[in-house]
A protein has these predicted regions:
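GST-like domain detector, emphasizing the conserved glutathione-binding G-site
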Residues: 1-174, 181
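GST-like fold's C-terminal all-alpha helical module
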Residues: 2-5, 122, 131, 142-246
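Phosphate-coordinating loops and pocket residues in cytosolic domains that bind phosphorylated ligands
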Residues: 91, 246, 255
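Residue-level recognition of oxygen-bearing side chains
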Residues: 117, 236, 249
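C-terminal helix/juxtamembrane-tail motif
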Residues: 250-263
Length: 263
């Protein structure tokens, strides 16, 4: 039983503990001056191969597979060292999260942040991997936004308390494992009736969801989390996961060679 007592007004502790405790602060904004490099390709991507980060590289590789001029320079943002709080990065994404992207293909560079928005921006810019039919397009967006709403319970909830927290808290792990299992069961039931998450065609919704839930189904997010959640029992999810994992563009998106920002 915890002896923690709620204060009337919360104040940030001097030491948080855990994997990210030293970086977390209750304020936003740049913490230091830093100039990010820019290459010659149309898209400048500042990211890391996390579940959110790989969405952008997979999407860009899928576009290239479709014959689109979607060349990009990918720069490694070392979030464990705080690169996301540098002034140039914050100018692209004031929320200090990866991935962040600059589209410099036009007269004026356009900043794009939030991984799902990067998917949507690129899909709309090139007219690929999103339907034009209103009903089908809405179904894709249903699932794209489902992922953005559901994944924080998986990552910030289950993943944090299962893998990153400085101590194992039974209530917290049970609470978020329950929700993670519910989400996996939902996807498994949906994929029992159709080849892709939004219907007959592969779309940005599949990229968004696979990057979290497909990787979890492969047990490639947190060590042994897939075993803990018994992901093998979700047969339809597993089949979909394997089908997408075998796509050449997905494989390339996972094997990107990142440039260093301080090289």
């Amino acid at each position: 039983m915890s002896d923690y007592q709620l204060p009337e007004v919360w104040e940030a502790p001097s030491q948080m503990g855990g994997a990210w405790g030293g970086l977390n602060q209750p304020t936003a904004g740049a913490r230091f001056e830093q100039t990010l490099p820019k290459g010659d390709q149309p898209f400048q991507l500042y990211t890391l191969p996390t579940p959110n980060g790989i969405k952008a590289t997979i999407m860009l590789e899928e576009l290239k597979e479709l014959g689109v001029d979607a060349g990009y320079d990918a720069y490694r943002i070392k979030i464990g060292e705080g690169d996301q709080f540098g002034s140039d990065f914050v100018a692209i994404n004031p929320n200090s999260k990866i991935p962040a992207m600059l589209d410099q293909s036009g007269d004026q560079a356009i900043r794009v942040f939030e991984s799902a928005n990067i998917l949507l921006y690129l899909a709309e810019k090139f007219g690929k991997l999103i339907p034009t039919d209103p009903a089908k397009r809405t179904e894709v967006l249903n699932w794209l936004f489902w992922q953005t709403g559901a994944a924080p319970f998986l990552g910030g909830g289950f993943g944090h308390f299962f893998h990153y927290a400085p101590e194992k808290i039974e209530y917290a792990i049970n609470r978020f494992a329950m929700e993670a299992k519910r989400q996996l069961d939902l996807l498994d039931k949906e994929l029992a009736t159709k080849p892709y998450i939004a219907g007959d065609d592969y779309t940005i919704a599949d990229i968004a969801i696979w990057s979290w839930y497909g990787r979890l189904a492969q047990d490639k997010v947190w060590d042994r989390a897939g075993i803990f959640l018994n992901v093998k029992e979700y047969k339809h999810l597993q089949a979909w996961t394997e089908k997408i994992a075998n796509r050449p563009a997905v494989q390339r998106g996972l094997e990107v060679e990142y440039k260093e920002i301080d090289a």
